[in-house]
């Protein structure tokens, strides 16, 4: 898969940069107002009762701030954050080692929690419900179960695919919060904040121009800002003006809706070779040279969100909005 500026997934080399940009408190966190307001109440109530916060499940598309919120929850509660991920916990013993190392009140963040193996989930159930760990010592007829007490802790799980969570695991979370795509104004505010951290001058129109092409996702907005900053420093006077921003984004082939060359390749392939559809996902895959699951998981979600593609029983079709965007006539199929 080609590297994409508009991918909402985190590149390995971006981790340190993202870490430096993350807000530390709810008051600094831009957007997700309903989620923030509810978390503020739950956190304050837990602190007033001197209890741990209920387990929290954060779900929604990638790049919207789930990891950031987990760290903020720990900061607001005044406790340590322990971080791991579903794929990193390969055996029940791995989870047991993590749980027994927790201090009272700690926040344990498990990213991609939907990828936990079922056998590991079963170890997690009593830990979440009763703060205890059941381990089996020995093998065969002499094997016996021993229960270990754990310190009270808060589990924060994050997932982009909440439908893959088992019902027993999902039901053990007391707080379930869905993160939504950001508005253009919220993204513009994030761009301005990030520019300040980068010590780069930017005006409001330039920030809006970057925001409108960021697909509702802060991670993409910050990535585009970094690339626009490069153009401003090399080709301009280091300040980001609207003219510099538009020129840079056009050079980067990210259009006014945030579509890139791969989006255009997919959409134009459907139009030019299949009359706009309906066309099956496997056929699209063969046409543009991408795996079917990559199209479904990476490319389609945004195109569905903005109404450029529809799924039908007979396959995918492009909508009239696509023809309008590309300044093409809508074909008459009558």
From Swiss-Prot:
Residues that bind Mg(2+): 67
Q: Which UniProt keywords apply?
A: ATP-binding, Cytoplasm, DNA damage, DNA recombination, DNA repair, DNA-binding, Hydrolase, Nucleotide-binding
In residue numbers, the region (Large ATPase domain (RuvB-L)) covers 1-182
- Which GO molecular function annotations are given, in alphabetical order? ATP binding; ATP hydrolysis activity; four-way junction DNA binding; four-way junction helicase activity
HAMAP family referenced in this protein's UniProt entry, alphabetically: DNA_HJ_migration_RuvB
Q: Quote the NCBIfam families the UniProt record gives.
A: PRK00080.1, ruvB
Which family is this sequence assigned to? Answer: Belongs to the RuvB family.
Per its record, how is this protein called by name?
Holliday junction branch migration complex subunit RuvB
Q: Which organism is it from?
A: Bacillus licheniformis (strain ATCC 14580 / DSM 13 / JCM 2505 / CCUG 7422 / NBRC 12200 / NCIMB 9375 / NCTC 10341 / NRRL NRS-1264 / Gibson 46)
Lineage, broadest ranks: Bacteria, Bacillati, Bacillota, Bacilli, Bacillales
């Amino acid at each position: 898969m080609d590297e994409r500026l508009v991918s909402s997934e985190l590149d390995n080399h971006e981790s340190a940069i993202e870490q430096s940009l993350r807000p530390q408190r709810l008051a600094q966190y831009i957007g997700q107002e309903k989620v923030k307001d509810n978390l503020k109440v739950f956190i304050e109530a837990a602190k007033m009762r001197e209890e741990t916060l209920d387990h929290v499940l954060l779900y929604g598309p990638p790049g919207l701030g789930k990891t950031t919120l987990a760290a903020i929850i720990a900061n607001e509660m005044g406790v340590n954050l322990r971080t791991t991920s579903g794929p990193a916990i390969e055996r029940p013993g791995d989870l047991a080692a993590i749980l027994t190392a927790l201090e009272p009140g700690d926040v344990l963040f498990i990213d991609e929690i939907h990828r936990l193996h079922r056998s590991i989930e079963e170890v997690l159930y009593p830990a979440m419900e009763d703060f205890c760990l059941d381990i089996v010592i020995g093998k065969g007829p002499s094997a016996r179960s021993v229960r270990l007490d754990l310190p009270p802790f808060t589990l924060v799980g994050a997932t982009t695919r909440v439908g893959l969570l088992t019902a027993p695991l999902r039901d053990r979370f007391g707080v379930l919060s869905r993160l939504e795509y950001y508005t253009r104004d919220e993204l513009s505010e994030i761009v301005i904040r990030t520019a300040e951290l980068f010590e780069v001058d930017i005006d409001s129109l330039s920030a809006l121009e970057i925001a409108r092409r960021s697909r509702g996702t802060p991670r993409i907005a910050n990535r585009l800002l970094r690339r626009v900053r490069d153009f401003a420093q090399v080709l301009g006077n280091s300040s980001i003006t609207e003219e510099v921003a538009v020129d840079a984004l056009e050079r980067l082939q990210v259009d006014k809706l945030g579509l890139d060359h791969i989006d255009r390749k997919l959409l134009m392939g459907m139009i030019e070779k299949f009359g706009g559809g309906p066309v099956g996902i496997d056929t699209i895959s063969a046409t543009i040279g991408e795996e079917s699951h990559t199209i479904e998981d990476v490319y389609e979600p945004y195109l569905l969100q903005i109404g450029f593609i529809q799924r039908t029983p007979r396959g995918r079709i492009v909508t009239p909005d696509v023809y309008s965007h590309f300044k093409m006539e809508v074909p008459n199929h009558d």
